[in-house]
Amino acid sequence: METANLVTISISCLLVSLTGYAIYTSFGRPSEQLKDPFEDHED
């Protein structure tokens, strides 16, 4: 396997895993701990 293919596959896997983690953090169980700054301040 060429070096360019290996680098491309590695970067693609990294981006997919980071995207999956971001979606899990936003909508999964950890999202219950996130705070909404607009709900904290009353006008």
From Swiss-Prot:
Domain of life of the native organism: Eukaryota
A Pfam match:
PsbN
Q: What does the entry list under GO cellular component?
A: chloroplast thylakoid membrane
Report the principal subcellular site.
plastid
Subcellular location(s): the record lists: Plastid, Chloroplast thylakoid membrane
Q: Which InterPro entries match?
A: PSII_PsbN (IPR003398)
Q: How does it sit in the membrane?
A: Single-pass membrane protein
Q: Which UniProt keywords apply?
A: Chloroplast, Membrane, Plastid, Thylakoid, Transmembrane, Transmembrane helix
Membrane-spanning segments: 5-27
Return one Gene Ontology term, BP aspect: photosynthesis
Family designation = Belongs to the PsbN family.
Question: What is the role of this chain?
Answer: May play a role in photosystem I and II biogenesis.
Name assigned to this protein: Protein PsbN
